[in-house]
Swiss-Prot record:
Listed GO biological process terms: transmembrane transport
Gene Ontology cellular component terms for the protein in this record: plasma membrane
This protein's name: Uncharacterized MFS-type transporter YbcL
Gene transcribed to yield this protein: ybcL
Keyword Transcription regulation found: no
This protein's record includes keyword Transmembrane: yes
Source organism per UniProt: Bacillus subtilis (strain 168)
Subcellular location(s) per record: Cell membrane
Entry's family note: Belongs to the major facilitator superfamily.
Keywords for the protein's UniProt record, in alphabetical order: Cell membrane, Membrane, Transmembrane, Transmembrane helix, Transport
A GO molecular-function descriptor: transmembrane transporter activity
Length: 390
């Protein structure tokens, strides 16, 4: 099997993990009804997953740093499958929380390991595209996994979704066992030493790009549906189609980000993508009550926002190459924190200012990310910058 197909297998695994994380938002009403809890209590399942994912991933990656990446993938995927099995067979809210915690612990390690393996087995000069493919699998869960999961839940009950994910996860474990090569781990790095990485200016600045880019995106995206309905005046019957197109644009943007990184380098792709991100957020607040105009801007926004994902992953992997796995795991945690903080800040502005303000607040966050990017690139020696471009 070619390495290209192996990378696609990793993308499929990433898709399963993403679906398991995001599916809750698509079946929240069914979970609340079946378990006899409020929607707010059901919503905590999302918060718990994100926090466990963010906090446990760096710790687990540090403890398993020297382990063969294929073996680590098998163990982490096994833990993830076990969590989904528990969600499928055990009754009650408390047991479901426990299952979500186990899922999240496995999920974080699976995604980071998939990104690491993809970068290591990719052909020279194609690492950015390889990472983009894995990221695209995770992104696809929003567009395909959540709607498909909703359909399965309506037909067979919401627990069947987790049973299906567990079954597909088991199949993925078998395929990975027979196809992925032995891949060396990184040099073990104690957790305190990982945290000490924040003392390095380029690492702290690099991770701040993730926080402000995705945080700015989250401010607006979290409240996109009510924004389109109440501010842009889009008909509710058309909303699902608009969101589907938005999701497809994110897939295209993610793939383009990897291609652009390989062809034109990190600085051009990162700064260019985030600049377009800001422009589209501002335009979205100016172009209202025009269905075609709003749709075009949404497509460009989604494309620009997600072109940054694989580029930033590759950028972090090149900042400290010998600790790429550690940095990628820290980045996964930062992404989870950014989404949570962005949603929280967006809620504050929606409640105390206006729904229309979220695009401007989101644009401000992305602007800070651009400034951090420019500071990093301008401080690098020309040769180091050339290395990043390759």
């Amino acid at each position: 099997m070619s390495n290209t197909w192996k990378i696609y297998i990793l993308a499929i695994v990433s898709f399963l993990v993403g679906t398991s994380e995001y599916i809750i938002s698509g079946i929240l009403d069914q979970i609340a009804h079946t378990l006899g809890i409020t929607l707010a209590a059901a919503g905590q399942l999302i918060t718990i997953f994100s926090l466990v994912y963010a906090l446990s991933t760096p710790v687990l990656m540090a403890l398993t740093a020297s382990m063969d990446r294929r073996k680590l993938m098998m163990y982490a995927l096994g833990l993830f499958v076990f969590g989904n099995v528990l969600a499928f067979v055990l009754p009650g809210y408390g047991w479901f929380i426990a299952a979500r915690i186990i899922m999240a612990m496995g999920a974080g390690v699976v995604v980071v390991t998939a990104l690491t393996i993809a970068a290591k087995i990719a052909s020279e000069g194609k690492q950015g595209s390889a990472i983009a493919t894995v990221v695209m699998g995770f992104t696809a869960s929003l567009i395909i996994g959540v709607p498909l999961g909703r359909m399965i839940a309506v037909a067979l009950g919401w627990k069947s979704v987790f049973g299906a994910i567990a079954l597909l996860g088991l199949i993925a474990m078998v395929v990975i066992f027979f196809t992925l090569p032995y891949t060396e781990g990184d040099k073990p790095v104690p957790l305190l030493q990982q945290l000490a990485l924040f003392k390095k200016r380029k690492v702290a600045m690099g991770l701040s790009i993730t926080f402000f880019w995705l945080g700015g995106y989250s401010v607006a995206y979290t409240y996109l549906s009510p924004y389109l309905l109440n501010i842009s005046g889009i008909n509710g019957k058309l909303l699902s189609g608009v969101l589907l197109i938005f999701g497809i644009a994110s897939l295209v943007g993610s793939k383009f980000g990897g291609y652009s990184t390989d062809k034109w380098g990190v600085p051009f792709t990162l700064v260019g993508g985030m600049t377009l991100h800001i422009v589209t957020l501002i335009l979205l607040s100016l172009v209202t009550h025009s269905y075609i105009g709003v749709l075009v801007i949404l497509i460009l926004w989604s494309f620009a926002a997600w072109s940054t994902g694989p580029t930033q992953q590759f950028h972090l992997a090149t900042i400290e190459p010998e600790m790429s796995g550690v940095l990628l795991s820290m980045n996964q945690s930062m992404m989870q924190f950014a989404m949570a903080v962005g949603a929280g800040i967006g809620g504050v502005f929606v409640e105390n200012v206006s729904l229309a303000s979220i695009t401007w607040v989101g644009a401000l966050g992305v602007m800070i990310a651009i400034i951090a990017s420019l500071l990093i690139f301008n401080s690098q020696p020309k040769q180091a910058l050339k290395d990043i471009n390759q």
